[in-house]
Protein backbone atom coordinates (compact mmCIF):
# COMPACT_ATOMS: atom_id res chain seq x y z
CA UNK A 1 0.00 0.00 0.00
CA UNK A 2 2.99 2.30 -0.35
CA UNK A 3 2.19 5.28 -2.54
CA UNK A 4 -1.58 5.18 -1.95
CA UNK A 5 -2.84 8.06 0.20
CA UNK A 6 -4.02 6.91 3.61
CA UNK A 7 -7.62 8.02 3.10
CA UNK A 8 -7.85 5.78 0.00
CA UNK A 9 -6.45 2.62 1.59
CA UNK A 10 -9.07 -0.09 1.93
CA UNK A 11 -10.02 -1.35 5.34
CA UNK A 12 -8.93 -4.89 6.13
CA UNK A 13 -10.96 -7.45 4.24
CA UNK A 14 -11.72 -5.27 1.19
CA UNK A 15 -10.56 -6.58 -2.14
CA UNK A 16 -8.26 -5.01 -4.69
CA UNK A 17 -11.23 -4.77 -7.05
CA UNK A 18 -13.11 -2.55 -4.61
CA UNK A 19 -9.98 -0.43 -4.14
CA UNK A 20 -9.74 0.11 -7.91
CA UNK A 21 -13.40 1.17 -8.01
CA UNK A 22 -12.76 3.62 -5.16
CA UNK A 23 -9.77 5.18 -6.91
CA UNK A 24 -11.59 5.35 -10.25
CA UNK A 25 -14.49 7.22 -8.64
CA UNK A 26 -12.30 9.82 -6.89
CA UNK A 27 -11.27 13.10 -8.47
CA UNK A 28 -7.62 13.66 -9.42
CA UNK A 29 -7.20 16.35 -6.75
CA UNK A 30 -8.31 13.86 -4.08
CA UNK A 31 -5.61 11.37 -5.05
CA UNK A 32 -2.81 13.56 -3.72
CA UNK A 33 -4.43 13.77 -0.30
CA UNK A 34 -2.77 17.15 0.34
CA UNK A 35 -4.24 19.69 -2.08
CA UNK A 36 -7.74 20.95 -2.24
CA UNK A 37 -9.32 22.94 -5.05
CA UNK A 38 -8.65 26.32 -3.40
CA UNK A 39 -4.85 25.86 -3.29
CA UNK A 40 -4.52 24.16 -6.64
CA UNK A 41 -3.05 26.33 -9.41
CA UNK A 42 -2.88 25.91 -13.13
CA UNK A 43 0.67 26.00 -14.44
CA UNK A 44 1.38 27.87 -17.65
CA UNK A 45 4.35 25.97 -19.07
CA UNK A 46 5.25 28.84 -21.43
CA UNK A 47 5.90 31.16 -18.49
CA UNK A 48 8.28 28.86 -16.62
CA UNK A 49 11.79 30.14 -16.06
CA UNK A 50 13.32 26.99 -17.54
CA UNK A 51 10.58 25.40 -19.66
CA UNK A 52 12.84 22.89 -21.39
CA UNK A 53 16.43 21.75 -21.35
CA UNK A 54 16.22 20.98 -25.05
CA UNK A 55 17.17 24.01 -27.15
CA UNK A 56 14.56 25.17 -29.64
CA UNK A 57 17.23 26.15 -32.19
CA UNK A 58 20.55 24.47 -33.06
CA UNK A 59 23.30 25.49 -30.69
CA UNK A 60 26.78 26.03 -32.13
CA UNK A 61 28.57 24.94 -28.97
CA UNK A 62 32.27 24.46 -28.50
CA UNK A 63 34.38 22.27 -26.28
CA UNK A 64 36.13 24.18 -23.47
CA UNK A 65 35.23 27.55 -24.99
CA UNK A 66 37.48 27.10 -28.02
CA UNK A 67 36.53 28.74 -31.26
CA UNK A 68 34.14 26.92 -33.52
CA UNK A 69 35.88 24.68 -36.03
CA UNK A 70 36.17 26.01 -39.53
CA UNK A 71 33.63 24.76 -42.01
CA UNK A 72 35.01 21.84 -43.99
CA UNK A 73 33.83 22.01 -47.59
CA UNK A 74 32.77 18.74 -49.18
CA UNK A 75 33.47 18.53 -52.90
CA UNK A 76 31.30 16.75 -55.46
CA UNK A 77 33.70 13.83 -55.83
CA UNK A 78 33.55 13.10 -52.09
CA UNK A 79 29.74 13.31 -52.12
CA UNK A 80 29.59 10.84 -55.02
CA UNK A 81 31.93 8.46 -53.17
CA UNK A 82 29.78 8.67 -50.02
CA UNK A 83 26.63 8.07 -52.08
CA UNK A 84 28.17 4.98 -53.64
CA UNK A 85 29.43 3.58 -50.32
CA UNK A 86 26.34 4.34 -48.23
CA UNK A 87 23.70 3.86 -50.93
CA UNK A 88 22.08 7.11 -49.78
CA UNK A 89 21.16 9.85 -52.23
CA UNK A 90 22.79 13.15 -51.15
CA UNK A 91 21.87 15.04 -54.30
CA UNK A 92 19.82 17.83 -52.71
CA UNK A 93 21.32 21.03 -51.29
CA UNK A 94 19.69 20.30 -47.92
CA UNK A 95 21.38 16.88 -47.73
CA UNK A 96 24.70 18.50 -48.63
CA UNK A 97 24.28 21.11 -45.83
CA UNK A 98 23.32 18.38 -43.36
CA UNK A 99 26.44 16.41 -44.29
CA UNK A 100 28.67 19.47 -43.79
CA UNK A 101 26.99 20.22 -40.44
CA UNK A 102 27.55 16.63 -39.29
CA UNK A 103 31.23 16.79 -40.26
CA UNK A 104 31.62 20.12 -38.45
CA UNK A 105 29.96 18.70 -35.33
CA UNK A 106 32.08 15.54 -35.39
CA UNK A 107 35.31 17.49 -35.97
CA UNK A 108 34.96 19.00 -32.47
CA UNK A 109 36.10 15.68 -31.06
CA UNK A 110 39.57 16.32 -32.48
CA UNK A 111 40.15 19.03 -29.87
CA UNK A 112 39.48 16.71 -26.91
CA UNK A 113 42.67 15.83 -24.99
CA UNK A 114 42.70 12.05 -24.49
CA UNK A 115 46.29 11.67 -23.26
CA UNK A 116 46.44 9.22 -20.38
CA UNK A 117 42.86 8.03 -20.86
CA UNK A 118 42.53 4.28 -21.26
CA UNK A 119 40.09 3.10 -23.91
CA UNK A 120 36.81 1.71 -22.64
CA UNK A 121 36.14 -1.75 -24.01
CA UNK A 122 32.74 -2.17 -22.43
CA UNK A 123 30.66 -0.39 -19.83
CA UNK A 124 30.66 -3.64 -17.87
CA UNK A 125 34.47 -3.84 -17.58
CA UNK A 126 34.40 -4.58 -13.87
CA UNK A 127 31.58 -7.11 -14.06
CA UNK A 128 32.29 -10.79 -14.39
CA UNK A 129 30.41 -12.02 -17.43
CA UNK A 130 29.73 -15.69 -17.81
CA UNK A 131 29.83 -16.59 -21.46
CA UNK A 132 28.77 -19.85 -22.99
CA UNK A 133 31.10 -21.86 -25.16
CA UNK A 134 30.73 -21.05 -28.84
CA UNK A 135 29.56 -23.94 -30.96
CA UNK A 136 29.26 -23.48 -34.70
CA UNK A 137 25.96 -24.78 -35.99
CA UNK A 138 24.10 -23.82 -39.13
CA UNK A 139 20.87 -25.10 -37.63
CA UNK A 140 20.01 -26.77 -40.93
CA UNK A 141 17.29 -24.18 -41.55
CA UNK A 142 18.85 -22.14 -44.36
CA UNK A 143 16.16 -23.06 -46.88
CA UNK A 144 13.39 -22.29 -44.37
CA UNK A 145 14.88 -18.87 -43.66
CA UNK A 146 15.40 -18.04 -47.35
CA UNK A 147 11.74 -18.84 -48.05
CA UNK A 148 10.87 -15.67 -46.09
CA UNK A 149 12.72 -13.45 -48.58
CA UNK A 150 10.95 -11.80 -51.49
CA UNK A 151 14.12 -11.90 -53.61
CA UNK A 152 17.21 -14.08 -53.13
CA UNK A 153 20.43 -14.35 -55.08
CA UNK A 154 23.15 -16.95 -54.50
CA UNK A 155 21.53 -18.02 -51.21
CA UNK A 156 21.46 -14.42 -49.87
CA UNK A 157 18.69 -11.93 -49.19
CA UNK A 158 18.40 -9.06 -51.69
CA UNK A 159 17.37 -5.75 -50.16
CA UNK A 160 16.74 -2.38 -51.82
CA UNK A 161 19.67 0.02 -51.45
CA UNK A 162 19.12 2.80 -48.88
CA UNK A 163 16.82 5.55 -50.02
CA UNK A 164 17.65 5.14 -53.72
CA UNK A 165 14.81 3.52 -55.68
CA UNK A 166 15.70 0.41 -57.64
CA UNK A 167 14.39 1.92 -60.87
CA UNK A 168 16.31 5.18 -60.83
CA UNK A 169 15.85 7.90 -63.41
CA UNK A 170 19.07 9.08 -65.07
CA UNK A 171 20.56 12.27 -63.62
CA UNK A 172 20.41 15.44 -65.67
From Swiss-Prot:
GO terms for molecular function: ATP binding; glutaminyl-tRNA synthase (glutamine-hydrolyzing) activity. Residues 58-71 have a biased composition (Polar residues). InterPro entries: Asp/Glu-ADT_sf_sub_c, GatC. Its EC number is 6.3.5.-. It is found in: Mitochondrion. The keyword ATP-binding applies. Keywords: ATP-binding, Ligase, Mitochondrion, Nucleotide-binding, Protein biosynthesis. HAMAP family: GatC (MF_00122). PANTHER family: GLUTAMYL-TRNA(GLN) AMIDOTRANSFERASE SUBUNIT C, MITOCHONDRIAL. This protein may be expected to contain an N-terminal transit peptide but none has been predicted. Allows the formation of correctly charged Gln-tRNA(Gln) through the transamidation of misacylated Glu-tRNA(Gln) in the mitochondria. The reaction takes place in the presence of glutamine and ATP through an activated gamma-phospho-Glu-tRNA(Gln). This is Glutamyl-tRNA(Gln) amidotransferase subunit C-3, mitochondrial. It comes from Culex quinquefasciatus.
Amino acid sequence: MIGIPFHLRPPPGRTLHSLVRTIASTKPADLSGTQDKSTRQKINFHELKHPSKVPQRPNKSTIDGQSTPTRIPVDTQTVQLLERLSLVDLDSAEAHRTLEDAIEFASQILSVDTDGVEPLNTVLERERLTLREDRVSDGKIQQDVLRNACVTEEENFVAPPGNIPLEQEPRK
